[in-house]
Each structure stands twice: as C-alpha cells, then as structure tokens.
C-alpha cells in the first residue's frame, strides 16, 4: 500500500470502473458484497481480509450476516475515497471469489 494516501480526483475515480469493476463507487468510498456457500466460508474470507487490512494499516467497515459479507472502504482521515481504498479493494479482489 502507498505510504501517503491522497483523495482520488475524478479521473482516478473513473479508472476504478476498470480496475475495481465489482465495487460500487460511492461519494466517499467503495462498497462491495459477497455471498458464500456457508458462514464458515464467509468468515474465512473475512479473516483473510483482516490480515490484508492489518498489514496495510487500513481497516474496512464491514458486516456479516450468515453467508453474506459487505465491505465499505473509505479514508476517514481524508474524508473520502482515497488511493488507499483503491489499493485495498484490489488486494481484496485478488483473494476473493467472483461471488
């Protein structure tokens, strides 16, 4: 992850449509939902994401209901969508199934 986070300008936000196509771009962050076959599978995914987030020192807002996981990424310190959110979204995508 980059050391210095910067808010994404409009061009960078537009590039997220190709680099993070499964994510919804909100005014101040990125949101994505996954559905798994079971709670255990969902929790395993969350554990992997937690390890990524801890290494990046950038932690998601998330919820889990049975086999469903929803993640929202935003950079509170900067008040919006930043390069750190985009980088973490791409890292999460690298380990997530296409559900």
Curated annotation (Swiss-Prot):
Ranges that cross the membrane: none
Gene Ontology molecular function: 4-alpha-hydroxytetrahydrobiopterin dehydratase activity
GO biological process, one term: tetrahydrobiopterin biosynthetic process
Domain of life assignment: Bacteria
EC number: 4.2.1.96
Annotated coiled-coil segments of the chain: none
Key words of the record: Lyase
UniProt catalytic activity: (4aS,6R)-4a-hydroxy-L-erythro-5,6,7,8-tetrahydrobiopterin = (6R)-L-erythro-6,7-dihydrobiopterin + H2O
Listed SUPFAM superfamilies: PCD-like
UniProt similarity note: Belongs to the pterin-4-alpha-carbinolamine dehydratase family.
Name of this chain's protein: Putative pterin-4-alpha-carbinolamine dehydratase
